[in-house]
Amino acid sequence: MEVNEVDAREIIEMIAKSKKKTPIVAYIKGKLDGIDFSKFKFFGNDQFGVLFGEYEDFRELLEKYGEKIEDYHLEVKARNSALPLADITKYRARIEPGAIIRDMVEIGEGAVIMMGAVINVGAVIGEGTMIDMNAVVGGRAIIGKKCHIGAGAVIAGVIEPPSAKPVVIEDEVVVGANAVILEGVTVGKGSVVAAGAVVTKDVPPYTVVAGVPARVIKQIDEKTKEKTRIVDELRNLE
């Protein structure tokens, strides 16, 4: 499985040096003619408008032009955020509403990211892999092709300490609902992690692990393959 692993130090440096942002959307009503909106993206007229910009700039706007603004509603999207969300239009994948994907995430063609899934900075999602509802893929985690990460599963992230080894889930792995894969673990190709398992050490290829902590309970057989079969039709983008 070939991947472009993101270096932890690169992420740390980017977070440390980035200008922290508090993005807002403001809906304002009043006598808006003569107000300087140059620091914002402004859509509206001289009576009503919508602003996209930074909280501090909006606070300064209120202080300067408060007598002209009759009312406003403010939506704060984040506070002192160090990294933006990803531009999901660049991915040839199915990404459902409510998924949260940070910048510097690689998502392969035909992948499926379901509602409520969270994918942190530097993670890699392989072609045809499904990240199910409310699953969490931590920073720098690497997931191969044609995997299924079950609802509520947690794939631990590793950004600090920067020397730590990220989680690697190889191709065609099925991780059951609410399972947890801890930092530094490699899950071998074609394996199955049972629902609710906590994986603390490497999993050999083509094995089934279960329990807390997870242990090998059997080798993959035809019955297991059928029960955990990946459905290609769910990855169809046409």
Curated annotation (Swiss-Prot):
InterPro entries: DapH, DapH_N, Hexapep, Hexapep_transf_CS, Trans_hexapeptide_repeat, Trimer_LpxA-like_sf
SUPFAM superfamilies attached to this UniProt entry: Trimeric LpxA-like enzymes
Pathway: Amino-acid biosynthesis; L-lysine biosynthesis via DAP pathway; LL-2,6-diaminopimelate from (S)-tetrahydrodipicolinate (acetylase route): step 1/3
Reactions catalysed: (S)-2,3,4,5-tetrahydrodipicolinate + acetyl-CoA + H2O = L-2-acetamido-6-oxoheptanedioate + CoA
Source domain of life: Bacteria
GO MF annotations in UniProt: tetrahydrodipicolinate N-acetyltransferase activity
Assigned keywords, A-Z: Acyltransferase, Amino-acid biosynthesis, Diaminopimelate biosynthesis, Lysine biosynthesis, Repeat, Transferase
Role according to the record: Catalyzes the transfer of an acetyl group from acetyl-CoA to tetrahydrodipicolinate.
Protein name per UniProt: 2,3,4,5-tetrahydropyridine-2,6-dicarboxylate N-acetyltransferase
Source organism: Thermotoga neapolitana (strain ATCC 49049 / DSM 4359 / NBRC 107923 / NS-E)
